[in-house]
UniProtKB/Swiss-Prot annotation:
InterPro entries the UniProt entry points to: UPF0181
Family: Belongs to the UPF0181 family.
This protein's encoding gene: yoaH
Source taxon at top rank: Bacteria
Pfam families named among the record's database cross-references: UPF0181
Protein name: UPF0181 protein YoaH
HAMAP family registered for this protein in UniProt: UPF0181 (MF_00507)
Source organism of this protein record: Escherichia coli (strain SMS-3-5 / SECEC)
Length: 59
Protein backbone atom coordinates (compact mmCIF):
# COMPACT_ATOMS: atom_id res chain seq x y z
CA UNK A 1 0.00 0.00 0.00
CA UNK A 2 1.22 3.51 -0.77
CA UNK A 3 0.10 6.46 1.33
CA UNK A 4 0.22 10.06 0.21
CA UNK A 5 -0.01 9.66 -3.54
CA UNK A 6 -1.02 12.88 -5.30
CA UNK A 7 -4.65 13.02 -6.42
CA UNK A 8 -4.50 14.43 -9.96
CA UNK A 9 -7.14 15.88 -12.24
CA UNK A 10 -7.52 14.51 -15.74
CA UNK A 11 -5.69 17.56 -17.11
CA UNK A 12 -2.78 17.04 -14.70
CA UNK A 13 -2.63 13.36 -15.66
CA UNK A 14 -2.57 14.28 -19.35
CA UNK A 15 0.27 16.77 -18.82
CA UNK A 16 2.23 14.11 -16.93
CA UNK A 17 1.77 11.64 -19.80
CA UNK A 18 2.91 14.25 -22.31
CA UNK A 19 5.99 15.04 -20.19
CA UNK A 20 6.85 11.33 -19.96
CA UNK A 21 6.52 11.03 -23.75
CA UNK A 22 8.82 14.06 -24.22
CA UNK A 23 11.46 12.54 -21.95
CA UNK A 24 11.26 9.24 -23.83
CA UNK A 25 11.59 11.05 -27.17
CA UNK A 26 14.81 12.56 -25.81
CA UNK A 27 16.18 9.05 -25.22
CA UNK A 28 15.22 8.36 -21.61
CA UNK A 29 13.87 4.89 -20.83
CA UNK A 30 10.18 4.63 -19.96
CA UNK A 31 11.00 3.54 -16.41
CA UNK A 32 13.32 6.49 -15.84
CA UNK A 33 10.82 8.93 -17.34
CA UNK A 34 7.99 7.64 -15.15
CA UNK A 35 10.17 7.71 -12.02
CA UNK A 36 11.28 11.27 -12.75
CA UNK A 37 7.73 12.44 -13.40
CA UNK A 38 6.50 10.76 -10.20
CA UNK A 39 9.27 12.46 -8.23
CA UNK A 40 8.38 15.85 -9.75
CA UNK A 41 4.68 15.34 -9.02
CA UNK A 42 5.30 14.42 -5.40
CA UNK A 43 7.63 17.40 -4.90
CA UNK A 44 5.33 19.97 -6.51
CA UNK A 45 1.82 18.72 -5.74
CA UNK A 46 -0.14 20.77 -3.22
CA UNK A 47 -3.62 19.23 -3.60
CA UNK A 48 -5.27 16.21 -2.01
CA UNK A 49 -3.50 12.94 -1.53
CA UNK A 50 -4.92 9.45 -1.77
CA UNK A 51 -4.05 6.06 -0.35
CA UNK A 52 -3.66 3.38 -3.01
CA UNK A 53 -3.40 -0.36 -2.57
CA UNK A 54 -1.93 -2.53 -5.28
CA UNK A 55 -2.46 -6.27 -5.06
CA UNK A 56 -0.78 -9.03 -7.01
CA UNK A 57 -3.39 -10.40 -9.41
CA UNK A 58 -1.79 -13.86 -9.44
CA UNK A 59 -2.72 -14.62 -5.84
Amino acid sequence: MFAGLPSLTHEQQQKAVERIQELMAQGMSSGQAIALMAEELRANHSGERIVARFEDEDE
